[in-house]
């Protein structure tokens, strides 16, 4: 396993890129089947989901649209619990199937807030599509239809996920080494 140091923390490889890409394709295949005959709007949550969204879209072969919003609930390695919308949604989602593309569902607080916000715009359906899910850390009930990989309650970085804005460019996913 390789290690990387970001700022004052050391991380080691936990999910290699090849495994990530295999799981992303499996999720895309399910979405293609589930939304056949529909034109969903993929709503990617920046900054963390940019790599996942890009790789996912390469395998989506149904008609679709993609847009982006930006929410923040992290500072360093802990969730602040404060969620603010930085970039809003401009598309009319009334009557549309919306697939929220997220890098990770941790406590679920950010996703719950997002579902509440989007629900006021009367979509036909809201669907959660996350690269990573920490089932042991969920504090709110969520119907997560598409979770590519379940992980333990560790702090991770890479493949779009950051530690204080660094490490997003790493191809693999790394776990914080507890020393």
Report residues per predicted region.
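PRPP-associated nucleotide enzymes
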Residues: 1-179
């Amino acid at each position: 396993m390789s290690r990387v140091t970001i700022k004052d923390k050391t991380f080691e490889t936990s999910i290699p890129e090849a495994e990530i890409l295999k799981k992303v394709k499996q999720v895309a295949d399910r979405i293609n089947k589930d939304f056949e005959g529909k034109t969903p709007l993929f709503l990617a949550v920046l900054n963390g989901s940019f790599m996942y969204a890009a790789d996912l879209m390469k395998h989506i072969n149904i008609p679709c649209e993609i847009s982006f919003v930006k929410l923040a609930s992290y500072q360093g390695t802990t969730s602040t619990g404060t969620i603010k919308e930085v970039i809003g949604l401009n598309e009319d989602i009334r009557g549309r199937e919306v697939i929220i593309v997220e890098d990770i569902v941790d406590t679920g607080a950010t996703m719950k807030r997002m579902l509440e916000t989007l629900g006021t715009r009367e979509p036909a359906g809201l669907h959660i599509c996350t690269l990573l899910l920490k089932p042991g850390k969920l504090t709110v009930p969520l119907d997560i239809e598409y979770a590519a990989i379940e992980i333990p309650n560790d702090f991770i970085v890479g493949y779009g996920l950051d530690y204080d804005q660094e490490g997003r460019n790493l191809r693999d996913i790394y776990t914080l080494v507890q020393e």
